[in-house]
Amino acid sequence: DEIQFNETTLWTGRSTDLSGGGSGYGKYENFGSVFAENLNDAFDFSSEGGAVNYYRQLDLSNATGKVYFEDKNGVKYTREYIASNPARVVAARYTASEPGKLSLRFSMKGGSIKGIKPSYAEDGGTFSGKLETVSYNARFKVVPTGEKATVKATAEGIEVMNADEVLLILAGGTDFDAYQQSFVSNTAQLAGAIEARVNDAA
């Protein structure tokens, strides 16, 4: 599962005099992706052990996307996605028809920006950096439920094991400010603002 995300203010380039041809204008950058890797041994991706009854749904009336599939043992899995403009987050909800059947590794990587190195701790991951003008920060948080659910941070990502349900919250942003001569503001507060946005939505 890959959730690719963007943000309208993630641009390379610098402020420039348009009479000079706009040579410093730069270009839009792809922010990155969050991946959900299945760790459940019910899937071995052979012809006999792969997912069955797979289908996708896009509901334009409530702006949600869904994916449904089953494993070889008949357990049904649902993944639901929504991007909330008021909360300024992307959310994904992972469920299974039987308790304790969700085991997933969540990780993230940068998009078109080179050299991004995510870090993982406790219940989420983050990466940050600076382009020529703007600084950027992205973060995700996982919230599992279930009596046997566990969460562990590794070098490869956040591992959720034996959960009944998992909620993923993702947000990203920059310090771009069109009203400042430098086109940036509150750089030191950016990481905290993104973290607060994710925690509030969770």
Pin down the residues of each PLM region.
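Aromatic-residue-lined binding/catalytic grooves and analogous aromatic/hydrophobic interfacial grooves
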Residues: 1-202
